[in-house]
């Protein structure tokens, strides 16, 4: 059986990993063995953080809505409860946006929530 030399394949694989590790500090961007581990770990962090990003944005929206609602004399939970009772179906992302950029509209929503309670 003929001897198979794998230099081309190994070189391509190493190049791919080192390209993915470009910009990493020190050996993590230069040494294949270290770079491979760094790329694997980076992938794990990316996978985890794609899920965490959704939670963190929701937390941010809730904090913003709570702050704006309290300026109008209502807690977050009572505000959301009032909106549900008034059958206002605006999600937290849009509510947070309104709270930051359109204070008048948010005040109107708070009044609507208060009247529904």
UniProtKB/Swiss-Prot annotation:
Name the UniProt key words of this record, in alphabetical order. Answer: Ribonucleoprotein, Ribosomal protein, RNA-binding, rRNA-binding
The answer on whether this UniProt entry bears the keyword RNA-binding reads yes
Q: Does the keyword Cell membrane apply?
A: no
Protein origin, superkingdom: Bacteria
Which GO MF term does the entry hold, naming one?
structural constituent of ribosome
* Gene Ontology biological-process entries: ribosomal large subunit assembly; translation
The protein's matches in InterPro entries, at most eight in alphabetical order, are given as: Ribosomal_bL20 (IPR005813), RIBOSOMAL_L20_CS (IPR049946), Ribosomal_protein_bL20_C (IPR035566)
Q: Which is one Gene Ontology cellular component term of this protein?
A: ribosome
Entries under SUPFAM superfamilies matching the protein: Ribosomal protein L20
Q: What does this protein do?
A: Binds directly to 23S ribosomal RNA and is necessary for the in vitro assembly process of the 50S ribosomal subunit. It is not involved in the protein synthesizing functions of that subunit.
Q: Which family does it belong to?
A: Belongs to the bacterial ribosomal protein bL20 family.
Tell me the protein's name.
Answer: Large ribosomal subunit protein bL20
């Amino acid at each position: 059986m003929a001897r198979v030399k794998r230099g081309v394949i190994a070189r391509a694989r190493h190049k791919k990993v080192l390209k993915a590790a470009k910009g990493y500090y020190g050996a993590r961007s230069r040494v294949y063995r270290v770079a491979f581990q760094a790329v694997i770990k980076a992938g794990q962090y990316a996978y985890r953080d794609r899920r965490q990003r959704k939670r963190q944005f929701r937390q941010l929206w809730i904090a913003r809505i709570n702050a704006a609602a309290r300026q109008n004399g209502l807690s977050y939970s009572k505000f959301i409860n009032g909106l549900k009772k008034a059958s206002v179906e605006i999600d937290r992302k849009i509510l947070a946006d309104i709270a930051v950029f359109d204070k008048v509209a948010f005040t109107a929503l708070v009044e609507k929530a208060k009247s529904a309670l």
